[in-house]
A protein has these predicted regions:
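Interfacial aromatic-anchored transmembrane helix boundaries in multi-pass membrane proteins
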Residues: 33-46, 69-101, 133
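Helical-face signature of the major facilitator-like transporter fold
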Residues: 25, 29, 71-75, 145
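Hydrophobic transmembrane alpha-helices
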Residues: 1-54
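Membrane-helix interface segments
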Residues: 18-21, 61-65, 104-109, 137-138
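Generic transmembrane alpha-helix motif of multi-pass integral membrane proteins
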Residues: 48-64, 96-102
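Central hydrophobic cores of alpha-helical transmembrane segments
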Residues: 64-75, 109-119
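Membrane-embedded alpha-helical hairpins and interfacial helices in multi-pass inner-membrane proteins
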Residues: 82-90, 100-182
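Small-residue-rich segments of transmembrane alpha-helices in multi-pass membrane proteins
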Residues: 29, 56-61, 117-125
Length: 182
């Protein structure tokens, strides 16, 4: 039942998104993009994984709005690239995993999830290269990226261990205040 409720297309909910949420999700997507660009000098150490986890846990399926605002901003800023195709699904996969595990309380568990995602990032992106260059290209692309996946893993682990719990609490509180008007 839980999987079914996640998969209901947003346009089938027959609910209009309130203006406050439209604004909030646009700003969160832009913040995600700005932070990723600000940290782009660090190889594969980025705040996107952390923020996707927080958005998924706090907003449920509505987390797709800020995620895809971020993806569209990436495309507009950097142009259409092969990795944009990966971004169309990898962040949603992380959000889905976070949503299923949203009741986890221990920060270490969230850090392990983020680290595993960072470690598997290249593997998750490899299918695009399988279709564009064949099996040999996809495997060589994935293997050559393992050092970057290790950095992604470590960066995600530390960032999520330190920041997930306070960010989750902050976003939950601010979102509740926004929805109640207090």
């Amino acid at each position: 039942m839980a999987f079914t409720s996640w998969c209901i297309p947003l346009d089938k909910l027959n609910k209009k998104l309130p203006l406050g949420e439209i604004t909030l999700f646009g700003v969160l997507g832009a913040i995600t993009f700005a932070l990723q660009v600000a940290m782009s000098g660090l190889p594969n150490i980025e705040p996107v994984s952390l923020l996707v986890l927080v958005y998924a846990v706090v907003f449920g399926r509505k987390c797709l709005y800020p995620i895809y605002v971020f993806v569209v901003m990436e495309i507009l800023f950097f142009g259409i690239q092969m990795w944009n195709i990966n971004y169309l699904y990898v962040w949603a996969l992380l959000a889905l995993a976070a949503w299923f595990l949203r009741d986890m309380k221990h920060p270490l568990a969230w850090a392990v999830l983020a680290a595993a995602f960072g470690l598997l990032f290249g593997l998750l992106c490899a299918p695009v290269y399988l279709f564009t260059g064949g099996l040999g290209y996809a495997v060589s692309w994935w293997i050559s990226g393992i050092p970057f996946d290790l950095m992604h893993c470590g960066g995600n682990f530390v960032m999520v261990l330190l920041l997930f719990a306070p960010l989750r609490k902050l976003v939950e509180n601010l979102y509740a205040r926004m929805r109640t008007g207090k």
